[in-house]
Amino acid sequence: ANVFKAKANIKARRIWLVFSLLLTANYGTDAANGIYPKSSYIIFVALCWIPFFIGELFFRIKGKATDAYRLCLVIGYGIFYTFVICTTDSPISFTYILPVMSLLVLYKNKKFMINCGIANVLSVIVSDVYRYVVLGCRSDADMKNYQLQVACLLLCYICYVMSIRHLNESDGALNGSIKAD
């Protein structure tokens, strides 16, 4: 079991690293071109990389199979993600969570995935309320985007939970057939 936890953590770390590199480069280019203030980019970089390196410390101190890593990933990336969706103009920024969250299926923990889904949807709702109230993004297109963001995330998490349920059932059936032999 620890071998599979370690493999899941390593795969999650790789995706977190790749996505952090991509977003850092993308937002760095935008900041250099004046799209975002440099002060926002500094906050962006800190929120992106500090949690990643804290996760690295967990790996070194507690080992690659530690359950603490997935919590570090979810909390650290979640804070970073919430900052991004509140500060970017892109209506598709809510999807930046999907590559990382889709890997959480590897942990095959339905309750954990449901809790992540609730937290993710709440962060998008907070962002949408912020954009509506503070930034004044109230057009019909904005309202449609808000609805589609929440609906898309809910459907993704429903599919993630269904996938986990299926994986757990198939593992149980496989284990049962092995025991029967």
Q: Predicted regions span which residues?
A:
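Residue-level signature of transmembrane alpha-helical entry/exit and packing/kink sites
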Residues: 66, 70, 74, 94, ...
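Membrane-embedded alpha-helical segments of multi-pass transporters/permeases
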Residues: 28, 53-57, 125-129, 157-161
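Interfacial aromatic-anchored transmembrane helix boundaries in multi-pass membrane proteins
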Residues: 82-89, 124-149
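Transmembrane helix interruption/hinge and helix-loop junction motifs
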Residues: 86-91, 108-111
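Short, Lys/Arg-rich, polar N-terminal cytosolic tail immediately upstream
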Residues: 1-6
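HAMP domain helices
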Residues: 142-154, 158-181
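Hydrophobic transmembrane alpha-helices and their membrane-interface boundaries in multi-pass
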Residues: 12-89, 96-102, 120-121
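Alpha-helical transmembrane segments and their helix-entry boundary regions
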Residues: 66, 105, 112-117
